[in-house]
Amino acid sequence: MRHFLFSLALMFTAALCAADRPNMIFIIADDVSWDDLGCYGNTAARTPNLDKLAAHGRRFDEAYLTASSCSPSRSSIITGRYPHNNGRASELHQPIAAHIPWFPRLLREAGYYTALVGKHHMTSDQSAEGEKPQPEPFDLVDPGNEPGNKGGHATWVKTLHERPKDKPFFFWFASLDAHRDWDGDKDWQEGLYGPKHDPATVRVPPFLTDDAATRQDLASYYNEITRLDYFVGKVVAELEKQGALENTLIIMMADNGRAFPRAKTRLHDSGMKTPFITHWPAGIQQPGTPSQSLISAIDVAPTLLELAGVPVAPTMQGVSFAPVFTHPNAEVRKHAFSEHNWHDYSAHGRSVRSEGFLYIRNNRPKEPWQGPADSVRSPSYEQLKVLRDEGKLTPAQADVFLAPRPPEELYRSDADADQLTNLASDPNYASVKVRLAKLLDDWTEQTGDSAPADISRDMFDRETGESLYKRKDNSYRGTPPGWDRDASHVNAPGPR
C-alpha cells in the first residue's frame, strides 16, 4: 500500500504546471577540497564564477560527504542513502542495488526533463531475486567531451540550449576536473581561463612538503578548478540569456577531497568536508548569508524532491535542508556520519561529526592510510617519501605512513581546522568521546553496518601505487560492509 500511494503521488505531481516547480542544476566536481575555492577563503585559487554564486546565494560551511571516494560518494548522493546501504556500491567502481531508486528517475517520472552530462561513475546492479531492473533515470546521458576538452563540461551549455522548453529540468553536470592526471592543465587555453596559477602562490597544507614539485602539483590542481569555474560561468550566462536563472536552483559540491596525501579517502575534513554552494534567486532568502547548518550528502535527494513537490522515497535516509533556504542557520540535523571502505586498498573506517567534534574509528588500525593509488603515484607523495627516508618528516607529514594507527581519533574542529591534534586519549574530552562513540554504535546497529571478515584486499602496492592484479582480475574483492545484514534493504536513517 505504501508503494502504491507513493506511485499515485508521483502521477499527481507530474500533472503540476512546470512554472510551479524550480529547475535544478546539480554541479559535481571531481576530487576538490572545500577550502580550495575563493569563497571559502583560498586567496590563490581563481574561482570568480563560483564566488559570485556564493555571494548571491547560500554557501554552506558545514557540509559533509558520506564517503571520500568517487563512486561510493556519488551513489550515496543519488540515492540519499549511506554507502553500506547501497549494496556493493559501498566500494569503488561497484553498482548500486537494483531495487534502490535514484532521485533523478523520480523527478523524470514526475515530469522533469533529466540529463546527466559528464562523468557518470554510477551503475545499477543486475536485478536479482526477481527484482525489476532500475528504470532509466535520465532522458539524456552525454559524456560532455569535445576535441581539446575531455573535462565533461564541453556540452553543458548545449544541453541547456537544446532542452525541451515545456518542462522543468534537472541536470546532473559532472566535471572531471580536478581528477588526476590534470587533463585541464595539459589542455590549458589561456584565452578562456586566464594565466596558469603561479606555484609560488599556492597554499601548501601542513601535511604536505613545501617544495617546488609539490607546489607545481598543487598549481596544476588549481588550474583544473579554474577551468571548471569557467564552465560554471558559461552555464549561468546561458540561464540568464534564456531568462531561466531566477527559478533555477544551482547546487555545486564535490564527490571527495583533493587527490593528494591525507585528503581523498580520508575521514578527516580534508577528505570529507565538501564545498557546497547554492544559488536560487526565487527561493533563497537573505542571499549572501552563509549557513552554519550541518548537512550531509544524503540530504541532497530529499531536498530536491521536496522542492519539486515529489514524494521522498521511503528508501532515503537523508533529511531535507530546504528550511535553510529561508533561515540560513535552521537546524536540520545534529549529526553527520561518514564511512571509508575499499578504494584501491583494504579499508574500514567510520566517523561521526557532532557537537563541533569529529570522532573517527579505525577498524583496521594496523595498516597505514596513505590515500588512493593515484595520490600514491603523485609528485607530492614522492616528496613525502624523500623526507621520510631522510628522517625529516614533521608529525603532520608522517601521518600518511603511520602504522599502526590509533584505533580512535577525536578532534575539536573549531580549534583544530587541519585536525592534527588527536584528543582521544585526553581525559578532558573523555565524556565527549564516550558520547560520540555511542552515537556511532547506534548508527552502526540501526543502519545495518558491519565489518566483513573477508574484506576486499589491496589492489595496488601501498608504496608505489602500481597494480597488483591483471586487468579484469577481481579476485581481490571480498564481501562489502553490511552485506551479511542485508543492509541494502534497511531504510532506517540512524541518529540524525
Whereabouts are the PLM-identified features?
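Short, flexible loop/turn segments with low-complexity composition
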Residues: S450-M459
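Structural signature of FAD isoalloxazine-binding scaffolds in flavoprotein oxidoreductases
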Residues: S413
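N-terminal signal peptide c-region/cleavage motif recognized by signal peptidases
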Residues: T13-A14
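Formylglycine-dependent sulfatase
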Residues: R2, F6, C17-E409, A417-D442, ...
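Short arginine-rich
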Residues: E445-G448
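Acidic helix-start/capping segments at beta-turn-to-alpha-helix junctions
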Residues: C70-S71, D458-D461
